[in-house]
């Protein structure tokens, strides 16, 4: 049936969807970018963050409550909170920037409020049931299960690897605990980023496939869009005809005036040859045309009394020469015969034997 959506979406269909805020993207890829950027940031600034983290731990554990305990505790908490904010704010800014870049890399720049508009279908129970049992929902469920199993397995494996460090931290100093904590955090971010990168790459492929699938078109929609884009075929043909007429009018009008002869095909081609040694050392093509243009050149030549020579092979060969260009060397002999015949005819006033074709 023509209503079945079996055709791939056109470029215009995809552009319209993008303009409406509908794009293929994977949240897992964005999460991977954030986690890996966090890992890289901590690895590059480990010494700075380590010092600040140790200072915070010292501040939290070294509270002198011998005098004014309540005031001392308030000051300590306020100072601790301020230092924590100052330490995490740049990290949060970097994470937000990386998340935006990762999303932009997948979707491009999208400025649309349509995705947040209220749609009646969203509160329609029938539409809700249809969405629940849709292919996209089933795929999302499978992805959720796979992601949960993968994350659980990765966390368990990481715990087994890091368990000695975690247990040993109980016997370490505060400074050593801070260093161990930074190392564990970097490893966690690296492992999480790698896992979500793999999941995100697969998810992006799935999202792209679903996006194309959801925007498939019927044959009628493709025809209608093509008609709207290109216009009605009859009108399009009229436009082309008008464009040809305007192009013909814009062409400089050719004339055979000054030519020694016009070589014809006999009706399809007409080429005017001029030979004036004082102007140019070789014979030149000063006018040429096919069909209607050829007929006009023949009529003008007849009116001006310029000899018309029927030589189909020569006419076709000369027509391929650029306008106002010289006669090519392979045609010298044949053109010379034509010009000699024209000269004899002009000298005697009566036509002689036409040159052999």
From Swiss-Prot:
Gene Ontology BP terms: protein secretion; symbiont-mediated perturbation of host programmed cell death
Bilayer-crossing regions: 29-49, 84-104, 149-169, 180-200, 323-343
GO CC annotation, single: plasma membrane
Topology relative to the membrane: Multi-pass membrane protein
Region annotated Disordered, chain positions: 1-21
Protein family: Belongs to the type III secretion exporter family.
Protein name, UniProt field: Hypersensitivity response secretion protein HrcU
């Amino acid at each position: 049936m023509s209503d079945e959506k079996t055709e791939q979406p056109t470029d215009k269909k995809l552009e319209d969807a993008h303009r409406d805020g509908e794009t293929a993207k994977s949240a897992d890829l964005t999460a991977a970018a954030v986690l890996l950027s966090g890992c890289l940031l901590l690895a590059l600034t480990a010494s700075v963050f380590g010092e600040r983290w140790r200072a915070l731990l010292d501040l939290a554990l070294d509270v002198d409550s011998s005098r004014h305990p309540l005031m001392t505790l308030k000051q300590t908490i306020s100072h601790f909170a301020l230092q924590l904010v100052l330490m995490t704010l740049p990290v949060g800014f970097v994470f937000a920037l990386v998340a935006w870049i990762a999303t932009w890399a997948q979707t491009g720049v999208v400025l649309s409020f349509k995705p947040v508009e209220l749609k009646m279908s969203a509160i329609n129970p029938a539409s809700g049931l249809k969405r629940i049992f849709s292919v996209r929902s089933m795929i999302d469920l499978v992805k959720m299960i796979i992601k949960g199993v993968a994350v659980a397995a990765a966390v368990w494996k990481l715990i087994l690897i890091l368990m000695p460090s975690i247990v040993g931290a109980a016997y370490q100093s505060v400074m050593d605990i801070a260093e161990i904590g930074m190392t564990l955090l970097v490893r966690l971010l690296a492992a999480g980023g790698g896992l979500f990168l793999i999941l995100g790459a697969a998810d992006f492929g799935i999202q792209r496939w679903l996006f194309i699938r959801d925007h498939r078109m019927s044959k009628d929609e493709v025809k209608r869009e093509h008609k709207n884009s290109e216009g009605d075929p009859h009108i399009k043909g009229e436009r082309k005809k008008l464009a040809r007429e305007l192009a013909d009018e814009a062409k400089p009008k050719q004339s055979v005036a000054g030519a020694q002869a016009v070589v014809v095909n006999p009706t399809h081609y007409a080429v005017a040859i001029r030979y004036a040694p004082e102007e140019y050392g070789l014979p030149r093509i000063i006018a040429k045309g096919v069909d209607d243009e050829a007929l006009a050149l023949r009529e003008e030549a007849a009116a001006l009394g310029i000899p018309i020579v029927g030589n189909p092979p020569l006419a076709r060969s000369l027509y391929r020469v650029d306008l106002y260009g010289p006669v090519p060397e392979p045609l010298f002999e044949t053109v010379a015969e034509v010009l000699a015949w024209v000269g004899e005819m002009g000298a005697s006033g009566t036509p002689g034997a036409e040159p052999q074709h």
